[in-house]
Amino acid sequence: MNIPKYQQAQVQGQQPNLQAQQILLQQLQQGQSQQSQPSIGGSGSAGQFSQQDIYNDNIAQQGLYQNSYQRPVQAQQPPQLQNIHQQQQFFPQQFSSQQQNQPQASSLQQYQQQQQQQQQQQQQQQQQQQQQQQQQQQQQPQIHLPQQYQQSQGQQVPHQPPHIQQQQFFNQQAAALQQQQQQQQQQQQQQQQPAQKLNSINIENPNSIYWQHQQQLCQLSRNANIPHYYARQYAANSRKNKNPYSDVKTVSLIDATRSIVSALNEQENSKSNPGSATNSALLQNKKLAQDLDDDHLQEEQRMRQKTQGRQLWCQLDLSGQGLVNLSPKLFQYDFLESLYLNNNKLTSVPPIVNKLRSLRTLDLSHNRINEVPSELGMCFNLRYLYLFDNNIKTLPNEFGNLIELLFLGIEGNPIDLKIANLVAEKGTKELIAYLRDLKPSFSKPPPRQWLLLEDDGEIIDPINNPDAYTNDNNNSDTNDTFTMMSYNTLCQHYATTKMYKYTPSWALEWGFRRAALQEEVLHFKSDLVCMQEVETRTFHEFWVPVMQGFGYKGVFFNKTRSKTMSESDSKKVDGCATFYKTDKFELLHKQNFEYNSVCMGSDKYKKTKDLFNRFMNKDNIALITYFNHIQTGEKILFVNTHLHWDPAFNDVKTLQVGILLEELRTIMKKYHHTNSIDEIKNASMVICGDFNSTKENAVYQLFSTGAVSNHEDLEGRDYGKFTDEGFRHSFKLKSAYDHVGELPFTTISPAFTDAIDYIWYSTPTLQVKGLLGKIDEEYSSHCIGFPNAHFPSDHIPLVTKFQIKKSGGNKKPDFKPDFKPDFKSGSSRKT
């Protein structure tokens, strides 16, 4: 026991007396056993610490140590009372014998009475202070020690040495400070966030697996209520990742959601593939663990490629900041992939949120949001959307565009029971499908504007020169003009719900799309119609009868893979179809052009490794038709083609076009019965179709400039002279829509939106007089992809009006014109 030095001297000096007193005390006790002994350390005795003796200092007044350990007030006692306390503390037996034989001094009794009065006054003051502290509790947090450290009024404080008392007091302070910090955080959260809604939605089946997930994740979200929760947790887990001896990482709301989604997917896969259920069950834990990090790894790799190794942050945590409104500048950060706005005071979300189309995670939980904007449906990359504990009553139909959404948190909202029950029974994906199949909330767009062009290519303003458009409508059928359409109609075998998840199921049905395609094609009354992705059976059984009723005849050629199929399966293969009005054009010749067959049948194309591995396994084709324009006698060659789709094979597309242009020179010589290069250059020709190439690709450059070399699309490839010397052609070609800088897009989807369809024409003999303009911008801003309720294909049609510059025509060929369409799929070119 550690005793101060001045007390040690006192104890050592009184050791002999202490032993004598103990012997005397035993004798007295034996001789006076019948006499009652006064209690030692009873109530009001000076031998113990008084419960009412507390320091009257600032700490006590502020209530920081309320209900805590009470300290003895030795500084307020007179010297004689201090001596009595010391004797009782260090010599209890001696003090006990004196208490039996000697009465207390009257002065000491008077002092004790005064002391009791002071203690009563202090009790009253302390009660008043407690009332004031309760009123100021939010401003000045209190420290409440654990129950084991608190004492009642009548309880005696056990005697402990000073150093043990000091250690206990320090432990009490540490526990009190820790509890104070927790109370401060709770009070701060209560001040910043609105009252939580802990009542669940009254659904029909609250025990369903999907609704249990809602409640579990909602509770986890409610617990994540500290400011910058996600940022703090990310930083903590990052530190744990660097330390191999650290604890297991804490699971966040996002991680828990990923685990739940992975488990559900595993169950669905096991049901669809019962034979592999055992193996899937064995790998379940591994798969779940991988799924937690797969998205992060893929995103990091994608961002590295996007930023070329530069660091770019893509997550923003504004949770628990008491935000009432959001600045419009926030939505200029269109690179954001995760945005956390939970535990704020937001009452609405601005419609400008649709600019954040890279968002994958959005947390709006624990706010005061009354309505979700329909523009949020444009954030089609969202995978996790948390709306827990708000005032949302319904969801907009545009949420059907959230094709990647894996989980939608709606617990804690007074939401429509129809929506809540659907989520509880079938989950988030079925809810999105239900909303997608509802009637579209936006109306049909206005018709695409028809644009007239001057001879120099300038667009005629319909406001300043309305007569030009009136005359064009009245005199549309002039002798030296013709109109043509190029349209990828989307083969019905490609129009699946898996491929076009953003399209309502009823809008993908072939019956609906077929009627809409027929209406759109016949609406423009084009003299010549070139279609791509037309099924073989559909051409013969649908398009030929329909088009014949409006004065058209047609020719068709399907893709080369049909040669390896049975007769029934080959009818499902798509190809290119060309329809022409018999009163405008006379068909002179038709040729089926197979890119791979032409390449293999000619010695001028070097058979390289890239040719066999990348080019030969593609079955793309072109349909070549040679017409006589009846009014003028002009011979015009039309090429209708569909190139390979994959952007990873841009070199293959370039080679396909290079071979096509190379062979067209020979074909033109044959049709025109001439070997003159100048005559071939000035011949009338139109090449249209789906080229699956943008303006930046080598295909566009080859058409527009006549040559391409050292392009990134061809880098590292070997195609003989084409890559050694570059691609070249002698035709003078121009894009019909080059007069308007090309359309903003000819195909639109969540993954890709751009112009990839073109109409190329020979400038020496033809000029553009009219174009079908772009789709209404307001309408397209609310669409994430075609087809939809108003557009039956994933492409839009291109319509152009051409004028033949020269009158008359070349001499007709000696062979008899072929009026009968050739429906055979074999190539007419001998190789």
Swiss-Prot record:
Keywords of this entry: Cytoplasm, Exonuclease, Hydrolase, Leucine-rich repeat, Magnesium, Metal-binding, Nuclease, Nucleus, Repeat, RNA-binding, Transcription, Transcription regulation
Reaction catalyzed: Exonucleolytic cleavage of poly(A) to 5'-AMP
Cofactors that this protein relies on: Mg(2+)
The keyword Transmembrane helix appears for this protein: no
Positions of the UniProt region annotated as Disordered: 29-50, 142-163, 806-831
Binding-site positions, Mg(2+): 533
LRR repeat start-end pairs: 311-333, 335-356, 358-379, 381-402, 404-426
Biased composition (Basic and acidic residues): 811-823
First-listed, main subcellular location of the protein, grouped into a coarse class: cytoplasm
Disulfide bonds: none
Subcellular location(s) per record: Cytoplasm; Nucleus
Lipoprotein in keyword set: no
Any one Gene Ontology molecular-function term assigned to this protein's record: poly(A)-specific ribonuclease activity
Signal peptide residue numbers: none
InterPro entries: CCR4/nocturin_mRNA_transcr (IPR050410), Endo/exonu/phosph_ase_sf (IPR036691), Endo/exonuclease/phosphatase (IPR005135), Leu-rich_rpt (IPR001611), Leu-rich_rpt_4 (IPR025875), Leu-rich_rpt_typical-subtyp (IPR003591), LRR_dom_sf (IPR032675)
EC id: 3.1.13.4
GO CC terms in record: CCR4-NOT core complex; Cdc73/Paf1 complex; P-body
Top EC category: hydrolase
Membrane-spanning residues: none
UniProt record similarity statement: Belongs to the CCR4/nocturin family.
Functional note: Acts as a catalytic component of the CCR4-NOT core complex, which in the nucleus seems to be a general transcription factor, and in the cytoplasm the major mRNA deadenylase involved in mRNA turnover. Ccr4 has 3'-5' RNase activity with a strong preference for polyadenylated substrates and also low exonuclease activity towards single-stranded DNA.
Entry protein name: CCR4-Not complex 3'-5'-exoribonuclease subunit Ccr4
Species of origin: Debaryomyces hansenii (strain ATCC 36239 / CBS 767 / BCRC 21394 / JCM 1990 / NBRC 0083 / IGC 2968) (Yeast)
